[in-house]
Amino acid sequence: MSNSISSLISVPFQYNYDDGFGDGGGQQSYINIQPVIPFSIGANWNLISRTILPVVNKGDFFPGDDSRTGLGNITQSFFFSPKDPTKNGLIWGVGPALQFPTATNDIAPNQWGAGITGVVLKQTNGWTVGMLANHVWSIGNEDTYGESSKTFLQPFVGYTTKRATSFGINTEAQYDWVAEEWSVPINLTVGQIIKVGGKPVQLTGGVRYWADSPPGGPQDWGARLAVTYLFPKG
């Protein structure tokens, strides 16, 4: 699923694993539950809701750091998107991005956040090329956790065959404006749509390479597995 604002309900469960944190022995695995739900608003526009709820396990970032599991902060994005592509075939959407302080067990700073998000892409002859981006500022608990100002950039290229096999490459780069640090994983994935109980499901697997990360951040290679349940509208 290369088009994150298609008029299709999708519910991905995306597992990720990275290591090399802290002194080199730290690990983190997490499942992103990220439903995408479109709503029609009149004859010409859609409102796309995209939620990301991380369930995280992490540990061994430093000596005596026990493994712990908890929730991360929820990121909620809304895209206002025209139902029809532009004359040049571009599909686009823009809207607000919100962060809810749902983190538990010291998984992440428990802060409210707000900002803006947007996506633009073009699909032709099986290819999808585009960019998703957002910027979120902290708006709460800054006395406890400090200020936060982060930009997320996700350029992506994908190809889907006539047999519904997909190949993709993207980065999920994040720039921390306060710390002045980049995190840049490069992801390579392969997916296949199958039928389970007569319903379409996409299975995806892949690897990532950390081209850049802050001190104490993930290093070298990571892995990704995903199951996406698809619910065509109508």
PLM regions: where:
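Transmembrane beta-barrel domains of Gram-negative outer membranes and organellar outer membranes
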Residues: 1-234
